[in-house]
C-alpha cells in the first residue's frame, strides 16, 4: 500500500492567499510575514512548500527557495533555520538578495528561480544536493 501525505490548509490561509494579486509587483513585508507564519504553522508545510505556494500566487514577488539557487547566489550551502520567525526572516532576506541579483544582471525576477537553478546545475555539476 502506498503512503500518502496530506496537508490540510485552513480556511483563513485560503482567505489570505486570495488577497494576493498576480498584478502586484512590490512585496508587502508585513502581509508576507502573516501569511508565512500561518503556512509554516500548518502541519506538513515547510519553507520550500510555503515559498512554492506563494510563487504560484505571484511569481513577480515570490520565488521558490531552493538549495541550488541559494548556493548559486550566496556561494554556500543553505542551512535553513529552525524557528518559524527565523525562517520567515531567512526567506525575506533571500527574496531581497534574489531581487538585487536580478536587478544587477537584468534577469526577469519571475523566472529567476528556474534560471539560477539551471545555472547551478551547469556550473556546479559535481556538488550534490542533500534532500
Region annotations inferred by a language model:
Residues 56-62:
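Catalytic Zn2+-binding segment of zinc metalloproteases
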Residues 1-38:
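Long, highly charged, low-complexity intrinsically disordered interaction regions
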Amino acid at each position: 500500500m502506498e503512503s500518502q501525505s496530506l496537508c490540510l490548509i485552513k480556511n483563513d490561509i485560503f482567505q489570505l492567499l486570495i488577497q494576493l494579486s498576480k498584478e502586484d509587483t512590490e512585496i508587502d513585508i508585513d502581509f508576507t510575514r502573516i501569511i508565512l507564519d500561518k503556512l509554516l504553522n500548518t502541519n506538513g508545510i515547510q519553507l520550500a512548500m510555503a515559498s512554492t505556494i506563494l510563487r504560484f500566487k505571484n511569481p513577480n514577488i515570490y520565488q521558490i527557495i531552493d538549495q541550488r539557487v541559494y548556493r548559486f547566489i550566496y556561494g554556500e550551502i543553505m542551512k535553513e533555520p529552525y524557528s518559524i520567525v527565523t525562517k520567515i526572516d531567512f526567506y525575506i532576506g533571500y527574496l531581497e538578495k534574489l531581487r538585487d541579483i536580478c536587478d544587477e544582471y537584468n534577469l526577469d525576477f519571475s523566472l529567476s528561480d528556474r534560471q539560477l537553478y539551471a545555472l547551478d546545475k551547469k556550473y556546479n555539476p559535481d556538488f550534490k544536493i542533500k534532500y
